Amino acid sequence: MSDNGNDNEDSGKLLYCSFCGKSQHEVRKLIAGPSVFICDECVDLCNDIIREEIQENTPEGNGDKLPVPIDISATLDEYVIGQQDAKKVLAVAVYNHYKRLRVGDKKKGKDEVELGKSNILLVGPTGSGKTLLAETLARLLNVPFTIADATTLTEAGYVGEDVENIIQKLLQKCDYDVEKAQQGIVYIDEIDKISRKSDNPSITRDVSGEGVQQALLKLIEGTIASVPPQGGRKHPQQEFLQVDTSNILFICGGAFAGLDKIIRDRSEKGGIGFSAEVKSKDGSKNVGETLKDLEPEDLVRYGLIPEFVGRLPVIATLDELDKEALVTILREPKNSLVKQYAKLFEMENVEVDFRADALEAVAEKAMVRKTGARGLRSIMENVLLDTMYKLPSEENVVKVVVDDSVIRGESAPLLVYGNSESAVAVPED
């Protein structure tokens, strides 16, 4: 190996990289081989090229290693607590979808049976894990993934986002590689917010409700979407990227507030006549249990048009998270909040100790706010804000203790100093 200032046996002879032609004085390192030399810059460039090729070929290379439903569900268990029924539905639907893409295409022409696409609808309360389930699936399958907010969508020609912007976002996630985008996953959040405003047609055009549902129909079912290259604006002389959406898996999610009442009304209606089944009102069921009885007709009554419901044949319902589930979410998943804060404090060489009663108090606060798991981080951030602000300036702190009184705002976190047996509370401002 030759360095910039190397003047041993090659004293007086200037060495050059055989690839880029730079001299030994222009680079940090020059590696010698049999009659050839390569500099550190060319080595880095070669590594980048090889890394890009490996990433590009990963989906094809893993084509025969598609995870089976049990493995998919097990991976979801690492990140999402509970929701076993939803995980099972998702695992089977996703497995069949990508099996259709990876195996079905190889047999095209030999078999006349054409497998249809099974898009998915997730129905569950806010903070129950709908978005996290979709994100984890995309990461597991190593496919492009994007999240779209249905509330920002409008019909083409109106102020707001065009539905084709969804495909543009997906392309951005994979550097405008059309082939990769065509096997991606799109999660459309807040899908319940585009329900039509009333059952009766109105003179006033519903551009953000039924109009958006109509616009999404073809996109979800499968069409050729024209997308401007590199996110430019559309104009007549421009060449568009043509993206076939027939192999893109669409997962729609929404809280559907009030849907449980529609389900109860339907299930409590009795028939007419002597043979009619008499049904009594069951007020003991919670929202999650009621949603398990969901039928497509309930979604139509809620405000989704029948054609749109038909494009989402796989329906998975998520349970409302109780206190025990929220405590488990705080502690057990791979990326749990307790583990994340432990890592943050570890960077300051400080141990953080969340007592069991503290985690229960956090869960209780989240239940009062009705934000599900989504509200847990906000509560933790507020509690630890002052400590994280002052800790980098403190010396000899080895441990921070958080109990239920800290969560309730009755006291500050306890700081334990290494040079003293005493524990000193952080003074409140």
Swiss-Prot record:
GO terms for biological process: cell division; proteolysis involved in protein catabolic process. Keywords: ATP-binding, Chaperone, Metal-binding, Nucleotide-binding, Zinc. One of its GO terms (molecular function) is protein dimerization activity. Pfam families: AAA_2, ClpB_D2-small, zf-C4_ClpX. Zn(2+) binds at C17, C20, C39, C42. InterPro entries: AAA+_ATPase (IPR003593), ATP-dep_Clp_protease_ClpX (IPR050052), ATPase_AAA_core (IPR003959), Clp_ATPase_C (IPR019489), Clp_protease_ATP-bd_su_ClpX (IPR004487), ClpX_bact (IPR046425), P-loop_NTPase (IPR027417), Znf_CppX_C4 (IPR010603). One of its GO terms (cellular component) is HslUV protease complex. It comes from the Bacteria. The keyword Nuclease does not apply. ATP binds at P125, T126, G127, S128, G129, K130, T131, L132. Residues 5-58 form the ClpX-type ZB domain. Component of the ClpX-ClpP complex. Forms a hexameric ring that, in the presence of ATP, binds to fourteen ClpP subunits assembled into a disk-like structure with a central cavity, resembling the structure of eukaryotic proteasomes. Belongs to the ClpX chaperone family. NCBIfam families: clpX (TIGR00382), PRK05342.1 (NF003745). ATP-dependent specificity component of the Clp protease. It directs the protease to specific substrates. Can perform chaperone functions in the absence of ClpP. This is ATP-dependent Clp protease ATP-binding subunit ClpX. It comes from Teredinibacter turnerae (strain ATCC 39867 / T7901).
